[in-house]
Amino acid sequence: MIDFQPVETAPTLELAPDDIAALLDELEAYHAIYSPLFQRREQREWSAKYVHGLLLELPRKSIEPMVLALEGANRNAVRAMQQFLSEGAWDDDAILRRHWQEVDADLGDADGVLTLDGSDFPKQGTESVGVKRQYCGELGKRANCQAGVFLGYASPHGYALLDRRLYLPEEWVTDDAYAERRQACGIPDDIAFTTKPMLGWAMIEALHQASSLRCRWVACDEGFGRDSALLDKIDGLGLWYFAEVPHDTRAWLERPAIAIPPWSGRGRKPPREQLVLDAPEPQTVVQIASALPSDAWTRQVIKEGSNGPIVAEFAQRRVVAVREGLPGPEVWLVLRRNVETGELKTYLSNAPVRTHQSRLVWVSGMRWPLETCFEEGKQYLGLGDYEVRSWRGWHHHMTLCILAHFFLVRVQCRLKKSSEPDGAAGPRTAVQCPTPPGV
């Protein structure tokens, strides 16, 4: 088993020999939670072995080295595992719905934060599902890769991965030249082109419908925050978004007047309201930030980092968002400025008017756990080591990686509890997030 070292978290615990010896029994008990969701005995067995393989200390965690480590030189076992992952008809979504209940039991909090982000996976060739030469975040440049969209969870008690979607570039869905590849990869016929923000929405909506995980916030970067339709859908669920937005995002300082223009008596009557003639133009969020007085900015600690507190300057004010050129909802504009470089980050949030700045500062530091999940998954759990090419195989692999990651979160939770002197109550897990102010 690996010695799991989370990034930018509270100090981790070394696994003692007794702990290591007990992990296989603990893993078996953990897998038993999900076993009833696999209809066939072979699926139950191979799913347990796959999760076990992801936890092994191996240089690469694709199917063959994992099976050889667990089963020895058994080529039939390798083929059986490949079939289980690439073609097996088992329900990822049912497994993840059960997983959300487990996350709530261990980490759930009324102030929980859902986090949306993408993670890319460099790949060779053109046959893997959804692969395309596109911007690859892992490499920081355009490259041949697959793009995933992920939903995570963070609370004062820890963090976890929740769900995953594979992004299919539009040509993969609509271009006849890709028809053979779609069939070879097993892409379902009813899959339509979906943007990354709407893939994120599909995961949020599914989680909300399940009603199994306590949460209040949704945090995302500007790749998602620029999509006002996504933000309005989140608002419609009664959740509070905290979304980074591009610097050219526009807003009004005060709600401008609108009216239906008078009808001239000829042609069609004006169908909708418009800004009145003397209405001010909306400003960019950068223009709004530059006009703030110096005393509008306060220095705040975002979170405790591995090298000490992370500090930035913050300002906020109410603004009116733009929707199709007209005034939309009144929201918070939150501005975060790097103390050393002056780099500006801009956010919009539909949190209530009464929300204190300290809570918005807290949420601004809650996106990092999902990035940490990606680092941990790729470094320790083979998140990017898969060699399957199919639609089903990609989602199966990611689902089992999500389970493997949360198993380690649970182990650290138990070890942290047992390390407290005299059984004293303490933080519930070694992979902690800061506590929100006022809670």
Task: Label each PLM-derived region with a short phrase.
Residues 156-185, 189-193, 246, 251-369:
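An anionic, glycine-rich sequence signature occurring as long contiguous blocks
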Residues 147, 369, 373, 396-402:
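Catalytic-loop motifs flanking and including active-site residues across diverse enzymes
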Residues 36, 40-43, 60, 213, ...:
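Intrinsically disordered or highly flexible coil/loop and linker segments, enriched in small
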Residues 151, 203-204, 377, 403-407:
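Buried hydrophobic packing segments
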Residues 2-219, 223-250, 257, 264-281, ...:
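Conserved, well-structured functional cores that handle cations and Mg-NTP chemistry
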Residues 118-120, 224, 272-278, 355-388:
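Short amphipathic alpha-helical "interface-anchor" segments enriched in bulky aromatics
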Residues 381-439:
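Basic, amphipathic alpha-helical segments enriched in Lys/Arg and hydrophobic/aromatic residues
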